[in-house]
């Protein structure tokens, strides 16, 4: 899980979702998991 000011899709499997006001990236590749913080 990477915590970043700006989250971006890193590959075509990445999806940007908003959960409880937090922007997250979910992906089949665990290295691509991110959240905004």
UniProtKB/Swiss-Prot annotation:
Q: Which GO terms describe its biological process?
A: translation
The record's comment on protein family reads: Belongs to the bacterial ribosomal protein bL36 family.
Q: Tell me which UniProt keywords the record has, alphabetically.
A: Ribonucleoprotein, Ribosomal protein
Q: Which NCBIfam families match?
A: rpmJ_bact
Annotated GO CC locations: cytoplasm; ribonucleoprotein complex; ribosome
Q: Does the keyword Transcription regulation apply?
A: no
Return one GO MF term.
structural constituent of ribosome
Write down the species.
Actinobacillus pleuropneumoniae serotype 5b (strain L20)
Q: What is this protein called?
A: Large ribosomal subunit protein bL36A
Q: Does the keyword Electron transport apply?
A: no
Q: Which SUPFAM superfamilies match?
A: Ribosomal protein L36
Q: Which InterPro entries match?
A: Ribosomal_bL36, Ribosomal_bL36_sp
């Amino acid at each position: 899980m990477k915590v970043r000011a700006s989250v971006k899709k890193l590959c075509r499997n990445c999806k940007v979702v908003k959960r409880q006001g937090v922007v997250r990236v979910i992906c089949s590749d665990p290295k691509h998991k991110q959240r905004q913080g």
